[in-house]
Amino acid sequence: DGKEIWQFKTEESFTISNSKFSLIIINDMVIFSNSIGDITAINIKTGLITWQLPTQSSSIINETYNFKISKLVSDGNSIIFSNNKNEFHSIDAKNGTINWINEINSNITPIITGNLIFTVSNEGYLIVIEKNKGNIIRVTDLFKYYKLKERKKIKPVGSAIGNTNLYLTNTDGKMIVVDLNLGVVKRVEKVSGDFISRPFIVNDNIFVI
């Protein structure tokens, strides 16, 4: 009937944040991030906190304009996310304890496939990570075809995986297609003259906005 069941107020920052909120549902928990890097799990029926994990020090409250965090993704057991403070996290979905942290500078949404995690750093490196231990398996420079001056201006927007390819869109309107088996760039396509969205794959078709 549209009646409010419960509400939960999150921490407010003192500045306007560039960080986007993210929310996922795992079993009986609503799990979300906020602008200062806290990850909170709420009981979906009662609205009470199940657990909360602050990922940043208290000083981040005054620096939230520059803080960016990726969307949360999960395999049902672990929650994966990263930020532009050189931190890539895996935490236990049941209790919020940290499984591992790796030094990766990225605020785009990571992708979980089987026992692997794929992400692209803000500097344009495709990084393949072993999901359980956080070991980096492979690193591929996707921006190596750009001149240094151009490279400094370009940031990844988002990625998607279809079959054995990864598709990465960038702020320059180009899409990079990567062969995941070989770890090499297959081609670079100009999609737009300017900023485009992350790619979406539906029924073997790729969509960007």
Name the predicted role of every residue range.
Residues 3, 44-47, 92-95, 130-133, ...:
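Short loop/turn segments that connect beta-strands within beta-propeller blades
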Residues 3-27, 48-76, 97-114, 138-161, ...:
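Extracytoplasmic beta-rich repeat domains
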Residues 32-33, 82, 120, 169, ...:
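Residue-level marker for isolated small/hydroxyl-bearing positions within beta-strands
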Residues 81-99, 106-109:
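Beta-propeller domains
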Residues 117-127:
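Acidic (E/D-rich), amphipathic helical modules within compact regulatory domains
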